[in-house]
């Protein structure tokens, strides 16, 4: 059973509006007179809350379905292929029940080809236990048509193989076979060098096993990058934004994560920030002068075509080589 059913989602927003309404009511009481009388008439009838919640649910659908491109620009003194690197991050696609299904593949295809990335990095939860086989097959066929010169790289999320709520339409062998045919390299606690076309300048891609999927039983950043910082630009992929300082200390220059969805359904993001569940909930943070971390809000949505926090996005990272 999904923990966030439609009733729970509506109730959470009703509660939020009731609290906001009570705060306004206290202000109206302090002002008194006609303001208080009008507010009591509206509020006690409950009309404002129900209309507000209905409007919010309609707005949340369009917010979920509106795919944007978020661009970050970075600089490095390390050598890059041709002096620059354009990296596209796709994360938390969750095709099927969420905002993205196979009907949106033409839109994704157009958007990705317009961006013309040097490499595509998938940071987990590209599939989950809700995906139906037609969506699974259609997206893998689509991925196979993408041919960035620096390759396609993938790390597992907590949903890709660790299925929480139901038996999936695919297994590990299906995923590995489909990705092999699409020339997507799966990185599970592995570090590899990538090359953009025929340029001899390498970029290191480090892929970590998902923390939740492994319950923390995975290689440390220092084990994955035993030589520490060197002159090779290093991109580390980790589905969940954890151990960012350790990643940076071991030699990562760019850390890409997803998982948080930017909150997606209020008050999930607020609670995550209050309890510091993730080291970074959304956006970019400079961990050290030589390392930045970016957390995507997700290229899709989990479970429902609803988003009241964050945004549905493709993330483009443009890295420029500068003089030391």
Residue ranges and their predicted role:
Residues 14-18, 72, 133, 153-155:
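Non-transmembrane, interaction-prone segments in cytosolic or luminal domains
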């Amino acid at each position: 059973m999904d923990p966030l059913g439609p009733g729970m989602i509506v109730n959470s927003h009703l509660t939020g509006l009731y609290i906001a309404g009570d705060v306004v009511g206290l202000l109206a009481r302090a002002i008194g007179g006609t303001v208080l009388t009008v507010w009591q008439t509206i509020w006690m009838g409950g009309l404002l809350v129900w209309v507000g919640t209905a409007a919010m649910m309609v707005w949340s659908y369009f917010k979920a379905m509106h795919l944007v491109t978020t661009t970050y620009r970075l600089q490095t003194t390390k050598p890059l292929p041709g002096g620059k690197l354009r990296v596209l991050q796709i994360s938390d696609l969750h095709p099927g029940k969420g905002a993205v299904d196979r009907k949106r593949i033409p839109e994704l295809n157009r958007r990705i080809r317009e961006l013309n990335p040097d490499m595509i990095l998938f940071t987990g939860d590209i599939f989950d236990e809700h995906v139906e086989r037609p969506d699974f097959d259609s997206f893998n066929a689509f991925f196979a048509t993408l041919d960035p010169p620096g390759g396609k790289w993938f790390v597992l999320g907590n949903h890709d193989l660790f299925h929480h709520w139901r038996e999936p339409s695919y297994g590990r062998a299906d995923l590995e076979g489909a990705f092999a045919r699409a020339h997507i390299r799966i990185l599970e606690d592995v570090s590899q060098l990538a090359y953009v076309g025929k340029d001899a300048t390498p970029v290191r891609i480090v892929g970590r096993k998902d923390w939740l999927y492994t319950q923390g039983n995975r290689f440390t950043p220092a084990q994955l990058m035993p030589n520490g910082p060197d002159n090779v630009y290093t991109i580390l992929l980790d589905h969940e934004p954890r151990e960012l300082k350790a990643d940076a200390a071991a030699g990562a220059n760019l850390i890409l994560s997803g998982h948080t969805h930017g909150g997606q359904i209020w008050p999930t993001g607020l609670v995550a920030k209050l309890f510091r569940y993730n080291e970074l909930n959304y956006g970019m943070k400079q961990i050290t002068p030589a390392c930045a971390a970016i957390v995507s809000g997700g290229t899709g949505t989990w479970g429902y075509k609803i988003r009241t926090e964050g945004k549905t996005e493709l993330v483009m990272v443009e890295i420029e080589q500068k003089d030391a």
